[in-house]
């Protein structure tokens, strides 16, 4: 189990993200850090960087352990000798090679219309977010060392939206999650294919940030892919059955919501390899599969009048939010799918 989860699960009624930095000296960045995650992605403020190359995934099938930590469902890739691994190269982390270590799933309460993604796009929160966390194996021997070291980690974020069918590998995880409804339960994943969780796109946005769990180390290069993958409402409800307790209780303690509140950019640049001008002229504004183009890179007052899922989830521009003071539910209450 990840060390912070052990402590966080001991005091579930006391510990919250706002207090992490006060609980342990190694967690001080959770309060004092100026490059914290997650953040809101403002499409109008993205900086196009033509030098950002596509992300490359090397490797295919691995063995992994799927665990209910009491805070999050986490897939940890087994580091076995003479067994395949998943390496990530290219993108903003060149020339380094990053080795996939774990995958976490963040989600909201589906039956209450709550969204669960950690990152938001134009103040819109999505139903779920999958995060693939890899460490710099070119510089560091393992995840623990890399976690506290410069250029140590790469986080690839996949937005999950509601669709008519669930993406195949996500469906497999959904089925497996039914066997780990309670804290501490685990199940083995054989022939697990992490790359199948990624959408078919070479476009992304990227920024320098932190882990979204204690100790919030500011050693993470974030890559948020431009297209979502999909999950049905019924399958999302299955994830909602996961609980924080070790056994069934008279009053269930569900895992949701499972995301950290938004943090300020504090002047950080958010770069993209999407040529905004080119996209606006070649991509239909009604394209449902593109997260950022659908949201609009430039101010577009007309989108508030559109009768689609995006406009229903959009926070009206008349409402002014400060990122650090926004409550988790403020974004999710913008509407439902």
UniProtKB/Swiss-Prot annotation:
Substrate binds at residues 212-213. One of its GO terms (molecular function) is carbonate dehydratase activity. It is found in: Secreted. Pfam families: Carb_anhydrase. Residues 17-274 form the Alpha-carbonic anhydrase domain. SMART domains: Carb_anhydrase. Keywords: Glycoprotein, Secreted, Signal. Its main location: secreted. Glycans are attached at residue 188. CDD domains: alpha_CARP_X_XI_like (cd03121). Gene3D superfamilies: Alpha carbonic anhydrase (3.10.200.10). Residues 1-16 form the signal peptide. It comes from the Eukaryota. The active site is at 140. GO terms for cellular component: extracellular region. InterPro entries: Alpha_CARP_X/XI, CA_dom, CA_dom_sf, Carbonic_anhydrase_a-class. PANTHER family: CARBONIC ANHYDRASE (PTHR18952), CARBONIC ANHYDRASE XA-RELATED (PTHR18952:SF208). Belongs to the alpha-carbonic anhydrase family. This is Putative carbonic anhydrase-like protein 2. It comes from Caenorhabditis elegans.
């Amino acid at each position: 189990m990840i060390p912070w989860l052990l402590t966080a699960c001991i005091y579930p009624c006391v510990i919250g993200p706002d207090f992490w930095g006060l609980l342990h000296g190694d967690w001080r960045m959770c309060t004092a850090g100026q490059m914290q995650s997650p953040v809101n992605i403002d499409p109008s403020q993205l900086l196009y960087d033509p030098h950002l190359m596509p992300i490359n995934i090397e490797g295919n099938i691995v063995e992994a352990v799927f665990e209910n930590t009491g805070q999050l469902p986490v897939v940890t890739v087994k580091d076995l000798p003479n067994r395949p691994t998943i390496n990530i190269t290219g993108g903003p982390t060149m020339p380094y090679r990053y080795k996939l270590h774990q995958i976490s799933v963040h989600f909201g309460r589906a039956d209450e219309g709550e969204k669960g993604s950690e990152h938001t796009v134009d103040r819109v929160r999505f139903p779920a977010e999958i995060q693939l966390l890899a460490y710099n194996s070119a510089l560091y021997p393992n995840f623990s060392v890399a976690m506290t070291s410069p250029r140590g980690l790469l986080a690839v974020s996949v937005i999950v939206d509601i669709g008519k069918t669930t993406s195949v590998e996500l469906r497999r995880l959904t089925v497996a999650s039914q066997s780990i409804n309670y804290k501490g339960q685990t199940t083995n994943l054989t022939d697990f294919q992490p790359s199948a969780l990624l959408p078919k796109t070479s476009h992304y946005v990227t920024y320098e940030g932190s882990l979204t769990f204690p100790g919030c180390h500011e050693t993470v290069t974030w890559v948020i892919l431009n297209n979502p993958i999909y999950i049905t409402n019924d399958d999302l409800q299955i994830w909602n059955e996961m609980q924080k307790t070790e056994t069934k209780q008279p009053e269930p303690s569900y895992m949701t919501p499972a995301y950290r509140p938004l943090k300020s950019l504090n002047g950080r640049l958010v770069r993209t390899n999407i040529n905004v001008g080119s996209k606006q002229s070649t991509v239909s504004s009604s394209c449902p599969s593109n997260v950022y183009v659908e949201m609009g890179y430039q101010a577009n007052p007309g989108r508030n009048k559109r009768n689609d899922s995006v406009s229903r989830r959009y926070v009206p521009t008349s409402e002014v939010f400060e990122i650090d003071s926004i409550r988790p539910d403020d974004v999710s209450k913008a509407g439902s799918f």
